Amino acid sequence: AALVGAGCFIGYALVLEQLLHAAVFSLFPAITLYPAAYTAYGCLAAGLFEETGRLMGLSLLCKKDRDLALGVGYGIGHGGVEAALLAGVNAAVNAAVMLGAPAAPQVTDALGAAGAGAFWAAGVERIAAMALHMALSILVWMAVTRRVPIWYYFAAVLLHAAANIPAALSQLGLLRSMWCSEGIILAVNAAVCLFVWSVYRKACVHRPLAG
């Protein structure tokens, strides 16, 4: 399940979604001048592609087995490969510079200005992102296995998009405080996890589905 999760993330988020971005930014280059439109587009695109990949991957996995472990495993693979590609590469570059590898002055200056707090914040953000992916995977798993209506897939798309808003605003410079941005991300991700836990309790704990 983890391998399917990793593969679907790569295929849907890193290939198909990037192709859409290339087409949209080519046809509508002015979208970057409108923060609200740019944020809405980017967050909804991420939610749509990643949750559609989740839906397709879990639909494939659940053909023979419908156990909760499939949803959990998918979330580990999806969130794990994202963390490895996003945070892992940055951590490797930072470690290499700190160990004395040659780097451009701009890189070393940026690392010095960021301080240890930025690295801690990145780690906390990745943990929060992993929890989000686990929760959304369980939500889509419940939809695939008919424990909840299929429209919960669309709820997953919107929840994913909402969780991406703070990071998008931070990238646009509209959230200048790193800790403010991280605090909002943690709060939103925690709210999503609590929502999914509530749905899971009602659908699977209090009214378990046989088979």
Annotated model-derived regions:
Residues A1-G211:
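Hydrophobic alpha-helical segments at protein termini of multi-pass membrane proteins
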